[in-house]
Amino acid sequence: MKMAKRGKKYVEAAKLVDRAAAYSATEAVELVKKTNTAKFDATVEAAFRLGVDPKKADQQIRGAVVLPHGTGKVQRVLVFAKGEKAKEAEAAGADFVGDTDYIGKIQQGWFDFDVVVATPDMMGEVGKLGRVLGPKGLMPNPKTGTVTFDVTKAVNEIKAGKVEYRVDKAGNIHVPIGKVSFEDAKLVENFKTIADTLQKVKPAAAKGTYMKNVTVASTMGPGVRVDVSTLA
C-alpha cells in the first residue's frame, strides 16, 4: 500500500511540471522543491546528457569540483598515508587515517566512509582494493584529486563540498547540487558551478550540441527540464 500512496503523491507532483517546457534554472529549482514528495531532506540532483561518445578515450569526462555551498552531506574521508602525511591528514580533519591496516578491514567488508584519498606512494597497496572500491566509485584517482601528496588540500576540499563527476556509458553525468532545504539561490549557484565546470572540460573531439539535455530533480520527485542558456 505504501508504494501506491507514494505513487499517487508522485503523480500529483508531476502534474505541476510541464514536460514539454524547458524552465530557467531558478524556476526549475523552485519546481523541484514544490514537487518534492519525500518526508526527509531529499537530495537535489542535476543530470546532464552530453553530446560525447564515452567509448572514445578522448571523450571521457571525469573530474571534481568544489560546490560553493556544498551538498548538505557530511562526507566521511578515509586517507591512506604514512608518517608526516598521515599526521597532516589527521590535522585536516580526515575521519580515518592509516596505511595498510585499513586494507584488511575493507577486504572484510568495512565501508563506513564516503571518499578515499591516497598518497601516490600508497597506491601500490591501495591498488589491491581495486576490485572492491572500483565498482563503488571509491577508488582514488589523480583526475579527481584523490591521489595526491597534498592531503590537507584534498581533505579540506572534500569537507567543503567537493563532488566528483563522471560520464557514464550513455553520455550522462549525475551530480548532487544540495538538499531541498537549501535556499533557492544556493541551489542555483551550485547548479551553475557544475554546468560551468562541464563546459570547461568539453572534449575537443566532441561534435554537435554538447549539452543536449539538462534536468534537475529531488530524490523522489519528477524531473524538471532546464533551459541550458540559463545556466551560463
UniProtKB/Swiss-Prot annotation:
PROSITE patterns: RIBOSOMAL_L1 (PS01199). Pfam families: Ribosomal_L1. The keyword Repressor applies. Keywords: Repressor, Ribonucleoprotein, Ribosomal protein, RNA-binding, rRNA-binding, Translation regulation, tRNA-binding. GO terms for molecular function: rRNA binding; structural constituent of ribosome; tRNA binding. GO terms for cellular component: large ribosomal subunit. GO terms for biological process: regulation of translation; translation. InterPro entries: Ribosom_uL1_bac-type (IPR005878), Ribosomal_uL1 (IPR002143), Ribosomal_uL1-like (IPR023674), Ribosomal_uL1/biogenesis (IPR028364), Ribosomal_uL1_3-a/b-sand (IPR016095), Ribosomal_uL1_CS (IPR023673). CDD domains: Ribosomal_L1. Binds directly to 23S rRNA. The L1 stalk is quite mobile in the ribosome, and is involved in E site tRNA release. Protein L1 is also a translational repressor protein, it controls the translation of the L11 operon by binding to its mRNA. Part of the 50S ribosomal subunit. NCBIfam families: rplA_bact. Belongs to the universal ribosomal protein uL1 family. HAMAP family: Ribosomal_uL1_B. This is Large ribosomal subunit protein uL1.
